Amino acid sequence: MARYNESVCRLCRRENLKMYLKGDRCYTDKCAIERRPYPPGQHGQGRVKFSEYGVQLREKQKVKRMYGLLEAGFRHAYQNAAAAKGKTGENLLQTLELRLDNVVFRLGFADTRNEARQLVRHGHFKVNGRKVNIPSYLCRAGDKVELRDRSRKVVRISEALEAVDRRGVPGWLELDKGGFKGTVRTQPSREDITMPIQEQLIVELYSK
């Protein structure tokens, strides 16, 4: 499966948005978008004016990169959101937030979503007492996400948890830092998702 293997800092610069793809570095003055707030490339300092379609496409690409998904996975999430009751755009964001890799990231067990995805794939977490190694697994309100006993000595996880106070944990989640576990208190509302996302643009793009 294809993956983006270049510097993730270029992605933030391309979208002109700090997407916190680099973990701790994003909170320092070493952050690439702080030092070079223009797109990468030879002609990056002159931003292009996009068409309506271009604006919609850029918004989709931004959200895909933010959550670390390829087109197939993102489209699948959109199709599920479109089939559910309620507003498709809000359903999409809720679906993305409830992915297990994102919940692990939001709880502070990993510095980035990419790192959280790797930890889930390597079987470090249990959901409601059972090992789950599928990053796209959708959590529900009341689910308990817990680090497995054998994984509690993993240095990167411990380091990430030490920095959780700086990043914060969203209100729809509850972290028991000492117990290496967290709870999905409720489904995230639109107000819980604070990143600047215009989900209606994505709906318009896929509706064409």
From Swiss-Prot:
Residues 98-161 form the S4 RNA-binding domain. Keywords: Ribonucleoprotein, Ribosomal protein, RNA-binding, rRNA-binding. CDD domains: S4. Pfam families: Ribosomal_S4, S4. It comes from the Bacteria. Part of the 30S ribosomal subunit. Contacts protein S5. The interaction surface between S4 and S5 is involved in control of translational fidelity. InterPro entries: Ribosomal_uS4, Ribosomal_uS4_bac-type, Ribosomal_uS4_CS, Ribosomal_uS4_N, S4_RNA-bd, S4_RNA-bd_sf. This is Small ribosomal subunit protein uS4. Belongs to the universal ribosomal protein uS4 family. GO terms for biological process: ribosomal small subunit biogenesis; translation. The lineage of its organism: Bacteria, Pseudomonadati, Myxococcota, Myxococcia, Myxococcales.
